[in-house]
Amino acid sequence: MTDTTQDFNTQLIDELLKERKRDRRMGLVKSGLVTLVAVAYLGFAAMMTGLPFMAEAPAGDFAAVVKVSGEIGAGKEASYANLAPLLKKAFETSNAKGVVLLINSPGGTPVQASLIHDYIVELKTKHQKPVIAVGEDMLTSGAYLIAVAADTIVANRSTVAGSIGVISAGFGFTGLMEKLGIERRVATAGESKNLLDPFGPRTETDVVRQKALLEAIHAHFKDTVTQDRGERLNLETAGLFEGAVWTGDQAVAVGVIDELGNLQGAVKKHFGVDETVVLAPQKPMFSALLKGFSLSVSDALVQTLAPRGPQALYYTER
């Protein structure tokens, strides 16, 4: 090999190494830019999540609509954390002549329903703005507790309404564990710490304590409904506070709701306006898609099988 050829090969190798280094640097720059954009987007999305969003609010008077949909509970769409900023925005908007609670829910946890109810009453008192609740398919249990915060409750004649009661449900696996040869090992400090363990036998003491807990929460529910509905309730109605449900037309007769109607008719009648604007939480892009993958199979199984706390919830399937 001549010196000239060797020099050429050396230069060629040097150039190739330099080009590879440039490519590596460009790759790092591109990766950094992509990461920066992703972090900026996620930060903005996190900032925007939960902020009230009012779509195309008209210049004139309108009714502000806040939807209560699905099961009520912490971490769900119908939670105090999600609905509180929407309710605040609805009451504070000057040309919103009234607030509508558009409800389609079987209920949920007593605490979340009570928090939402109490906040509506607080805002209504502070801003002196009328509130109506409009029930769609379901207006039961915890959802009904929220509805009684309104001045007027409206529903369709086929709406299912009522279910003033509390339920706690779960499963027992003692027989299955015995068949599978599985031994339950648990240690507690405090005799009530393992109350209603699904992997152990249910005792009479457990049943008595759970019943006392449910009855206390039920009493809170009844007190709120009685106070808010007042003389409109027919207290002689059989099953009124025992979890009974009625269709919309039946519910009017017993004072559970006030009148039959729909959203548009109700806002025209009670607020004297035609326009309605729905307030919704501002969600980041792809949040709905990501939500579907947020629970692992094991998490979902545990949530399904584990005993549930008290629920102000109406079950349509038994």
Language model region names:
Residues 1-132, 137-139, 145-156, 168-318:
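N-terminal organellar transit peptides
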Residues 158-166:
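Active-site loop architecture of trypsin-fold serine endopeptidases
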